[in-house]
């Protein structure tokens, strides 16, 4: 199945609710979202929660929250596999009746004994198909005894090469002789991943599946299930894994790996969306900042690389800053608000004047509060170098009165400060850093005169008089 005018594209993201939404899963969801949107298709969300031991409702909720925050709005769902058990049972029965699957009554001990014998003989460990040779009478006898059973797919002996043209990796083929009669339904009645996902994807009309390359071993099994059920297979595409900068698999030791952690650290969803869309994909080597619509228009599975993608935090910080600069100052300040309130600070209208001065120095929304704590409170932090500047104890007497009498803009403030320094016999390069330390507790920052203009006049004068 390929993309053409008559195909209604439907992609899906199907996470297991066993934890937070990992950035790797978020990237998979994002690729499927972009693919569907590019072709006017449908993006479906399915929660694969058939494992009651590990699946938690709170994780499901957190995944939905993270996806919404990231801008991955689904068109259909969320469906829950746990509510579809009757559908899996229906297709299990169909395969049993058609002789394409069979009940396996082997115990764990019998299977381990089988594998041990194979190991001793130097053979690959695999199921030997013994239960496929049971007579109907033997099956009935075991059922009447209430013996538990799994259900296995009867892999055709003459199937030969299983091949598909991967949307990302190109032609892939595997010999069916490498596969044994694998389990479709466990002895507790729950479907295996491969069985449930095939039934779900087909009955939900999924046409294209983009997922991690760790699913490549699952693909031939799924193709065999599609064939057993007489269904057309969707298009498959397998994307490379994500590595940390040290070229090992991305994990907590590389920093945050959950989407909600990036939200809480002050990254814009637009920026993380942009970053993840380029993680392993390349469009223009000279450009890294895109809007969502541009990424939708550009998306092409063939542009996804064959090698693992490296998660570069510095690149994410850069993209985040650029997206902050793209926002109107009013909207950026509104995005900053929760981070200020978390520190017990209130956003005031005059803070808007600080945005153009500070945005170039910000990497995240949190940074506004860290860089400019002095606009929220007189109890601001004083950095080490500013403490050294303050220790010089340069004169301030009468300065507040001179500033109070002038027009409150950068040019007039600069003129007053220069004249004052000259009158006191102090070089401006020595005096201006001292003034910055007095009013902000910082040794570096935006233009001193523009900073003073942006700050409330009474706040600046109060601090000059107090010091």
UniProtKB/Swiss-Prot annotation:
The EC number(s) this enzyme carries: 6.1.1.17
Leader sequence segment: none
Record's catalysed reaction(s): tRNA(Glu) + L-glutamate + ATP = L-glutamyl-tRNA(Glu) + AMP + diphosphate
Enzyme class: ligase
Motif 'HIGH' region: where in chain: 15-25
Binding sites annotated in the UniProt record for ATP: 252
GO cellular component: cytosol
Motif ('KMSKS' region): 249-253
Pfam family, one: Anticodon_2
Chief site of localization: cytoplasm
GO biological processes: glutamyl-tRNA aminoacylation
GO molecular function list: ATP binding; glutamate-tRNA ligase activity; tRNA binding; zinc ion binding
Location of this chain's protein in the cell: Cytoplasm
InterPro entries: aa-tRNA-synth_I_cd-bd, aa-tRNA-synth_I_codon-bd_sub2, aa-tRNA-synth_I_CS, aa_tRNA-synth_I_cd-bd_sf, Glu-tRNA-ligase_bac/mito, Glu/Gln-tRNA-synth, Glu/Gln-tRNA-synth_Ib_cat-dom, GluQ/Sye
Family label: Belongs to the class-I aminoacyl-tRNA synthetase family. Glutamate--tRNA ligase type 1 subfamily.
Subunit structure: Monomer.
Function: Catalyzes the attachment of glutamate to tRNA(Glu) in a two-step reaction: glutamate is first activated by ATP to form Glu-AMP and then transferred to the acceptor end of tRNA(Glu).
Name the record gives this protein: Glutamate--tRNA ligase
Phylogenetic lineage: Bacteria, Pseudomonadati, Coprothermobacterota, Coprothermobacteria, Coprothermobacterales
Gene designation: gltX
């Amino acid at each position: 199945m390929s993309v053409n005018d008559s195909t209604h594209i439907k992609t899906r993201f199907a996470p297991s609710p066993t934890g937070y939404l990992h950035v790797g899963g978020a990237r998979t969801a994002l690729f499927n979202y972009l693919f569907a949107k590019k072709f006017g298709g449908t993006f479906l969300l399915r929660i694969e929660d058939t494992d009651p031991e590990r699946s938690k409702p709170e994780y499901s909720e957190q995944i939905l929250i993270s996806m919404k925050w990231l801008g991955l709005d689904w068109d259909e769902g969320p469906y829950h596999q746990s509510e579809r058990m009757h559908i899996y049972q229906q297709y299990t029965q169909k395969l049993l009746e058609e002789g394409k699957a069979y009940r396996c009554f082997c115990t764990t001990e019998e299977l381990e004994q089988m594998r041990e014998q194979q190991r001793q003989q130097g053979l690959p460990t695999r199921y030997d198909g013994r239960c496929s040779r049971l007579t109907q009478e033997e099956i009935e006898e075991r059922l009447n005894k209430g013996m538990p059973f799994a259900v296995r797919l009867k892999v055709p002996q003459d199937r030969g090469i299983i091949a598909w043209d991967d949307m990302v990796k190109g032609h892939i083929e595997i010999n069916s002789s490498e596969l044994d009669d694998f389990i479709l339904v466990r002895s507790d009645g729950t479907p295996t991943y491969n069985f449930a996902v095939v039934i779900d994807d087909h009955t939900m009309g999924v046409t294209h599946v983009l997922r991690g390359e760790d699913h490549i071993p699952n693909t031939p099994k799924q193709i065999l299930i599609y064939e057993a059920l007489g269904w057309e297979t969707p298009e498959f595409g397998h994307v490379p894994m994500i590595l940390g900068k040290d070229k090992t698999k991305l994990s907590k030791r590389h920093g945050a790996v959950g989407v909600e952690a990036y939200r809480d650290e002050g990254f814009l969803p637009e920026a993380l969306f942009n970053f993840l869309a380029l993680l392993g994909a390349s469009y223009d080597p000279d450009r890294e900042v895109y809007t969502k619509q541009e990424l939708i228009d550009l998306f092409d599975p063939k542009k996804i690389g064959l090698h693992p993608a490296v998660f570069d935090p510095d690149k994410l910080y850069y993209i985040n800053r650029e997206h902050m600069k793209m926002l109107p100052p009013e909207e950026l300040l509104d995005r900053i608000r929760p981070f200020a309130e978390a520190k017990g600070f209130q956003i005031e209208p005059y803070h808007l004047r600080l945005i153009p001065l500070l945005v170039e120095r910000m990497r995240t929304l949190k940074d506004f509060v860290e860089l400019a704590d002095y606009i929220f409170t007189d109890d601001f932090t004083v950095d080490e170098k500013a403490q050294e500047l303050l220790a010089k104890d340069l004169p301030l007497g009468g300065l507040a009165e001179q500033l109070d009498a002038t027009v409150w803009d950068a040019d007039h403030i600069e003129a007053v400060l220069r004249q004052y320094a000259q009158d006191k016999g102090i070089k401006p390069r020595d005096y201006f850093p001292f003034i910055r330390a007095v009013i902000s507790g910082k040794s570096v920052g935006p233009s001193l005169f523009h900073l003073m203009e942006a700050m409330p006049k009474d706040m600046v004068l109060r601090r000059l008089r107090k010091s």
